[in-house]
Curated annotation (Swiss-Prot):
<dbReference type="GO" id="GO:0048020">
    <property type="term" value="F:CCR chemokine receptor binding"/>
</dbReference>
<comment type="subunit">
    <text>Homodimer.</text>
</comment>
<dbReference type="InterPro" id="IPR039809">
    <property type="entry name" value="Chemokine_b/g/d"/>
</dbReference>
<dbReference type="GO" id="GO:0030335">
    <property type="term" value="P:positive regulation of cell migration"/>
</dbReference>
<keyword id="KW-0202">Cytokine</keyword>
<dbReference type="InterPro" id="IPR036048">
    <property type="entry name" value="Interleukin_8-like_sf"/>
</dbReference>
<comment type="similarity">
    <text>Belongs to the intercrine beta (chemokine CC) family.</text>
</comment>
<dbReference type="GO" id="GO:0061844">
    <property type="term" value="P:antimicrobial humoral immune response mediated by antimicrobial peptide"/>
</dbReference>
<keyword id="KW-0732">Signal</keyword>
<dbReference type="GO" id="GO:0008009">
    <property type="term" value="F:chemokine activity"/>
</dbReference>
<dbReference type="GO" id="GO:0048245">
    <property type="term" value="P:eosinophil chemotaxis"/>
</dbReference>
<dbReference type="GO" id="GO:0006954">
    <property type="term" value="P:inflammatory response"/>
</dbReference>
<dbReference type="GO" id="GO:0005615">
    <property type="term" value="C:extracellular space"/>
</dbReference>
<protein>
    <recommendedName>
        <fullName>C-C motif chemokine 4</fullName>
    </recommendedName>
</protein>
<feature type="disulfide bond">
    <location>
        <begin position="34"/>
        <end position="58"/>
    </location>
</feature>
<feature type="disulfide bond">
    <location>
        <begin position="35"/>
        <end position="74"/>
    </location>
</feature>
<dbReference type="InterPro" id="IPR000827">
    <property type="entry name" value="Chemokine_CC_CS"/>
</dbReference>
């Protein structure tokens, strides 16, 4: 039972920390990072070192956090913890 819960927890964590998908508009413009889903869990603040917001070319708005390990995680910009992290990163 404990092994199954551990495996499920690890699988959910890996899925939450997957990098966002890339989509490229037609033409010679460089690729644009877009998010098609958001992380379901709040990231530990000490994992996050930077962020950027997706452009208006993307179908849905997102904040993309970069972790210490170089992963990019899509987050919902309307969630309070996301806004708090963005404010904190702007101040530092």
């Amino acid at each position: 039972m404990k092994l199954g819960v551990t495996v499920l927890s690890v699988a959910l964590l890996v899925a939450a920390l997957c990098p966002p998908a890339l989509s490229a508009p037609m033409g010679s413009d460089p690729p644009t990072a877009c998010c098609f889903s958001y992380t379901l869990r709040k990231l530990p603040r000490h994992f996050v070192i930077d962020y950027f917001e997706t452009t208006s070319l993307c179908s849905q708005p997102a904040v993309v956090f970069q972790t210490k390990k170089g992963r990019q995680v899509c987050a919902n910009p309307s969630e309070s913890w996301v806004q708090e992290y963005v404010d904190d990163l702007e101040l530092n």
